[in-house]
């Protein structure tokens, strides 16, 4: 399905008007004949005036997908709130370094601040000033890119069970609190950071991890089920099959508030094997 993922990302990269104009030019000039990806790239460049070389090198001619995440945030108050946002770049299926414009959204209960930045290194830092006091900060909140993250965001209006599609997470909301809350689950399809200190004796997944953010009203409380799968099923497997190669009784759930902290084993967790 990478072709559809690339097309989705290309629309964001070029903007819809230029993207569809480029597709029309491509069909007019190459229709009913043979064409390749290089010619498609050149047609888009010619019609839009945007040099598409780097995009095609990153997304078409390189296997896999990029992964962009927020490593840490430093806030300095003033007339505006000044946020210094440190990002981290990883990749899925390659060791390629991408150059991509991405949106960073600083979200609170009432108003969001979204800015577009260019991530072009393993680590970057961006300064964003806003009058708001965001509850959480996310990259590509509105899913303009087909990167190595699948996510789902839901406004919680009642207690009970909620499925978070494409994340392998289910919520069971116990109490709402004073008002509605927003929960965002991201399923990251790259290996998490390792332990800061060696010698823990714990091996972390080499394939994926989750993050949870949102706006949580005082008193909001939920349980969550995180589904792992060590099978070789073509439909749902090949996720944890390299990680689970024996019994499952030693599996633990690790958590850290952010990248500044060490991973810790969560207690009060029920492991359901099978």
Where are these regions (language model features)?
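Amphipathic alpha-helical substructures
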Residues: 1-85
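Self-processing/autoproteolytic domain segments and adjacent N-terminal interaction modules in large
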Residues: 157-266
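Beta-strand-rich interaction surfaces with strong enrichment in secreted/lumenal proteins
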Residues: 57, 115-117, 211-215
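Surface-exposed loop/edge segments in extracytoplasmic proteins
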Residues: 109-117, 259-268
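Short, intrinsically disordered, charge-balanced linker/junction segments flanking boundaries
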Residues: 1, 268-274
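Short acidic/polar inter-strand loop motif in beta-rich domains
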Residues: 141-153
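Short conserved micro-motifs at the rims of enzyme active sites and ligand-binding pockets
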Residues: 95-98, 148-151, 236-238, 265-267
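Beta-strand-rich binding/interaction modules
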Residues: 66-69, 73-138, 251
């Amino acid at each position: 399905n990478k072709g559809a993922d690339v097309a989705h990302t290309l629309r964001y990269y070029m903007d819809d008007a230029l993207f569809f104009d480029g597709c029309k030019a491509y069909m007019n000039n190459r229709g009913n004949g043979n064409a390749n990806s290089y010619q498609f790239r050149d047609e888009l460049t010619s019609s839009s005036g945007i040099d598409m070389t780097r995009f095609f090198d990153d997304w078409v001619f390189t296997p896999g997908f990029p992964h962009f995440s927020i490593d840490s945030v430093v806030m300095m108050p003033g007339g505006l709130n000044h946020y210094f946002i440190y990002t981290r770049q990883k990749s899925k299926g390659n060791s390629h370094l991408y150059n991509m414009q991405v949106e960073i959204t600083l979200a609170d209960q009432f108003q969001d601040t979204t800015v577009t930045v260019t991530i072009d290194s393993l680590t970057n830092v961006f300064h964003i000033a806003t009058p708001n006091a965001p509850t959480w900060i996310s990259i590509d909140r509105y899913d303009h890119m087909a990167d190595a993250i699948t996510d789902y965001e839901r406004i919680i209006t009642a207690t009970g069970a909620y499925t978070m599609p494409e994340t392998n997470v289910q919520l069971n909301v116990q109490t709402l609190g004073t008002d509605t809350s927003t929960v965002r689950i991201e399923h990251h399809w790259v290996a998490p950071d390792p332990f800061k200190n060696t010698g823990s004796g714990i091996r972390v997944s080499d394939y994926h991890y989750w993050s949870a953010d949102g706006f949580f009203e005082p008193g909001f409380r939920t349980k969550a089920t995180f589904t792992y799968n060590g099978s070789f099923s073509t439909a749902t497997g090949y996720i944890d099959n390299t990680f689970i190669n024996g019994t499952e009784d030693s599996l633990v759930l690790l958590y850290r508030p952010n990248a500044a902290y060490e991973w810790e084993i969560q207690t009060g967790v029920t492991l359901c094997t099978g």
